[in-house]
Amino acid sequence: MLQEFVIAAAAGGSNPSAALSQMGFEHLITEMTSSPGDFAVSWVVLITLIAMSAASWYWTVINIFRATRLKSAADRVTTAFWDAPNAQDAIRAMEEQPASEPFSKIALDAAQAAAHHQRAEGSTGGMGESLSRSEFVDRALRQAVTRESTKLQSGMTLLATVGATAPFVGLLGTVWGIYGALIKIGATGSASIDAVAGPVGEALIMTAIGLFVAIPAVFAFNFFSKVNSSVIAKFDTFAHDLHDFFATGSRVR
């Protein structure tokens, strides 16, 4: 269809250079601002894409800081736990960690479960009779790992949604721009570049913006998916070692 526009424009003898100067982003914004009612759909598309881009970059930055913090904290916290001479000192070391630190929270949950089960062992009909110490600690660790793993997924759904839908939002602007070009041709009776350059330029720009929003979101989603998988594997390994320590008293380090 665009090829037909160019052929018709050449036959009409219009000035392509002047027409193509109307296809820039600055010209599009000027037209949208001067007559917002005529560009209602374009405004909706543009604002939606800007909001999607802002949200995806926000969660990208948040995940970068979180991944950096977890990478430095993983070995530090686990080493602090296993280097403690006894369980009391290990628990105290975990309590000194920041409240948002996941490895220390997993260790504290395991310690609390073991202590709670020990207190209940002497009670009649308590959980000490229904669940063994190993089972009780294992359940607490599973819940802790699941909780902390879920927190790692914050923003991931949004990144996936932006990466999957932003091109189609931009495509909506493309379709609407070409539709506007056809309406303009019907109203003026001219298929010259002068008549269609603005709407077609708008269409192409909206497509480019949609891709510009989607591509970083897709890269971020794939990168953080890999990072989160690595962190979750460390959660599982630490939880397994904690289970052996609190359930049987054996140290892995």
From Swiss-Prot:
Disulfide bonds: none annotated. Involved in the TonB-dependent energy-dependent transport of various receptor-bound substrates. Protects ExbD from proteolytic degradation and functionally stabilizes TonB. Keywords: Cell inner membrane, Cell membrane, Membrane, Protein transport, Transmembrane, Transmembrane helix, Transport. The keyword Cell membrane applies. Belongs to the ExbB/TolQ family. It comes from Xanthomonas campestris pv. campestris (strain ATCC 33913 / DSM 3586 / NCPPB 528 / LMG 568 / P 25). It is found in: Cell inner membrane. InterPro entries: ExbB/TolQ_transport, MotA_ExbB_proton_chnl. This is Biopolymer transport protein ExbB. The chain crosses the membrane at residues 39-59, 163-183, 204-224.
